[in-house]
Amino acid sequence: MTEPAKREDSGLPEAVTAIRPEVAAFKPYAPGLSIDEIKERYGLSQVVKMASNENPLGTSPLVQQTLRTHADLAFRYVQSGNPRLVSAIARSFGVAAESVVTGNGSDEVIDLIIRVKARPGKHNIVAFNPCFSMYELQTRFCGVEFRQVPLRADFSFDYDAFVGAADADTAVAFITTPDNPSGYCPPVEEIIDLARRLPSSCLLVVDEAYMDFADDPAAHSVLPHLTEFPNVAVLRTFSKSYGLAGLRLGFGVMHPALADYVKRVRLPFSINILAEYAGIAALQDTTFHAQTLRVTREGRTYLTGALTEAGCTVYPSAANFIMFALPENCPHDARAVFEALLRRGIIIRPLSSYNLPQCLRVSIGNRHENELFIAQFKELLRG
């Protein structure tokens, strides 16, 4: 049995310091900087945030009206299991309601799958490197071995190495498509082939948080194929194309029997009543959703062209963000450019946390934000 970690010299009571070693060594998730932080730090009145892959159009008008209409219900507990939201998701995505697991963001579903599938001291979990940090954070917090497989130099998936890292004790394998932070998006046939090659007891979790932004989602999403592959689960979120990042709402789709196990251990009422109403309204407002996709795809084309023209190495993206490396003759490194943009009121994402210190990631904004970013960025490149 693993002994609790103790910090003898901390001066704190042992009841406080005798904690699990996984917690003592835990490094929490590092979120992007907020607009208020930068305003206060640099004394700015206006700040443009292009770091957290949020919706460039904000929140749907129908969602806003729905929240106003139902605000007086905030004192009520939500109906257990969110059946109305589950039904709306099932209709919108063409899946069986009994296969849907809703969560307080897709992060909660990630955590639940790990807890349900992986046993500490026995199982392992496999993902690519770099990957979304929540896969590693929650795996290590649960005391489970976390294995990572390097991406290829062009950030495509090395499937042979990935399958080679898995064994009979691999409980879960995570992939993200489109991938974060590169935006790489493989054809669905490759994901299906991977599902066939993994050990039979391994659950392949395909995180499709950014799938809506692909030019042709049907060519890349495994969601329509789930009934053929009981060893695959798909994650989706309302944070990106549906504009509900602040309400924390996501879901997973998986085999009904697995969904039942996951729902058994989910904390009650983890989705609040207003988030449920907002999620249903977001699915209903198809006009806003379509406009979001159009603006994002147009902005992605514009930023890709402008950054390429500026001499950057731009990695092809199917998501609502772009990863790029600075021109070879740039007088600044990536960290310096990030900090200089902060002082000018523009927040993008440095990628040192992904072990990519030479790269930056910019979220697609609206037209004004995109043009402002490019103007300020080019001015920095001129020294």
From Swiss-Prot:
Sites bearing N6-(pyridoxal phosphate)lysine, chain numbering: K240
Enzyme category, top tier: transferase
Span of the signal peptide: none
Entries under CDD domains matching the protein: AAT_like
Family matches, as Gene3D superfamilies: Aspartate Aminotransferase, domain 1, Type I PLP-dependent aspartate aminotransferase-like (Major domain)
Subunit field text: Homodimer.
Essential cofactor(s): pyridoxal 5'-phosphate
Record's protein name: Histidinol-phosphate aminotransferase
Reactions accelerated catalytically: L-histidinol phosphate + 2-oxoglutarate = 3-(imidazol-4-yl)-2-oxopropyl phosphate + L-glutamate
Transferase recorded as keyword: yes
SUPFAM superfamilies documented for this protein: PLP-dependent transferases (SSF53383)
Pathway of action: Amino-acid biosynthesis; L-histidine biosynthesis; L-histidine from 5-phospho-alpha-D-ribose 1-diphosphate: step 7/9
Native species: Oleidesulfovibrio alaskensis (strain ATCC BAA-1058 / DSM 17464 / G20) (Desulfovibrio alaskensis)
Upper classification of the organism: Bacteria, Pseudomonadati, Thermodesulfobacteriota, Desulfovibrionia, Desulfovibrionales
Pfam families: Aminotran_1_2
Family in the record: Belongs to the class-II pyridoxal-phosphate-dependent aminotransferase family. Histidinol-phosphate aminotransferase subfamily.
Any GO BP: L-histidine biosynthetic process
One of the record's GO molecular function terms: histidinol-phosphate transaminase activity
